[in-house]
């Protein structure tokens, strides 16, 4: 379940985050989720290590940054063999949108390599790439 400290009171405009709101966030993004403070007023973003990726949505994100299309079965296999996968989602209770992605491979103890870092071009230049990398590095260190 989402820890109340991970989603602060600023996440919802109404003030404090209720238990029901935390349950909704948990159901949308999984237990390893946290708010990404947004430089864009009125929009909320969430990092998640546990929300499953829609492979087509992920490939659309990667193509939007200029990468060539890859077979979905290979993408699935790469995800399955990754040490860490992080999605950055534009929060919408009905339809969260993937706007950023990164994954890591490694031995889980000493070494890790970051791969496939992408931020939707609409959100580039707003600091989301730096926020994503900061989150990834922090998550790897906590493993």
What is each model feature region?
Residues 1-34:
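N-terminal mitochondrial targeting presequence
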Residues 22-73:
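Short amphipathic alpha-helix that is part of the acyltransferase structural core
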Residues 52-55, 121, 130:
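Alpha-helix N-capping/helix-start residues
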Residues 123, 127-135:
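Conserved acetyl-CoA pyrophosphate-binding loop and the N-cap/start of the following alpha-helix
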Residues 133, 138-143:
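Conserved GNAT acetyl-CoA-binding A-motif
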């Amino acid at each position: 379940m989402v820890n109340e400290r991970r989603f602060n009171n600023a996440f919802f405009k109404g003030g404090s985050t209720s238990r029901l709101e935390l349950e909704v966030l948990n159901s949308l993004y999984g237990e390893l989720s946290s708010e990404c403070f947004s430089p864009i007023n009125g929009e909320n973003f969430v990092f998640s290590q546990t929300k499953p990726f829609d492979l087509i949505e992920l490939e659309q994100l990667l193509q939007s940054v200029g990468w060539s299309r890859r077979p979905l079965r290979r993408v699935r296999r790469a995800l399955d063999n990754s040490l860490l996968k992080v999605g950055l989602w534009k929060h919408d209770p009905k339809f969260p949108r993937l706007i950023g992605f990164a994954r890591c491979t490694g031995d889980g103890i000493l070494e890790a390599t970051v791969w496939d870092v992408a931020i939707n071009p609409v959100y580039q230049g707003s600091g989301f790439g730096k926020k994503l990398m900061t989150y990834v590095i922090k998550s790897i260190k906590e493993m």
